[in-house]
Amino acid sequence: VKHLQTGHLETLNPQALVGADGLWSDTRNYVLPKTAPRITGLLAYRALLPMQVVPEFLRQQDVRVWVGPRMHAVLYPVRGGEFLNMVVIAPGQLPESLKDWDYDANPQDMFQALGVLHPHLKDVLEAVPNWRRWPIFDRPPLASATQMAKGRIALLGDAAHPMRPFLAQGAGMAIEDAAALATCWARVDLPVNERWRLYAEMRWARNAMVQARSIRNGRIFHMQGPMRWGRDLAMRLMGESLMDVPWLYAGP
């Protein structure tokens, strides 16, 4: 084990190991063959804008979503309404280094990728002085429990199932993983490898469903041409029920 702050190396012989080390997990390589995360070709442009400089029509306690060809934007208040959080997802050029997650962003690149915008969205995006750029990666949906645990090693969160942000469930699934992991770890009547097997059996299928639904949502949000007209008509006719996911919010 290498201590990040001091660089000191220490050899440990733990009873069990949990890999919660994110998208570029090293622990994952002890459970599965070493492969790189999948490049989606999408970037998430992110910013926080003080609410006092937000256009008046957007100073509300609502979540607002714009969808368009190969893009979508989500805006919502945070910190008790003090700031407006903005996330804009569109195709873009990857940074040279991929091991970080937060990079400087050139607003001109973002606006070029977005194309023609609704005036309300354009106004608020242009009010942002500084944008950040997050490359989006994922992995294919889990195919079996063996992809989340092996022997005395278990994977949690993005180390096991990184997902696209189109369902906003990456952190949620990691929290559910942690709760299931704690439940299984408490099974002191079982050997460690059986506890982790039980954990993986509890979690893999739900995580796979969320991964797959996130990919599906992205395709819907970013539709182009006649398909987006059909999407818009369906949204007008069906309203919120079109995107409803009761199986998700009912819990595992």
Where does each model-flagged region fall?
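Alpha-helix N-cap and coil->helix boundary residues
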Residues: 40, 191-194, 229
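Alpha-helical membrane-targeting segments
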Residues: 212, 216-252
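Alpha-helical structural elements of signaling/regulatory helical domains
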Residues: 81, 116-120, 187-191, 205, ...
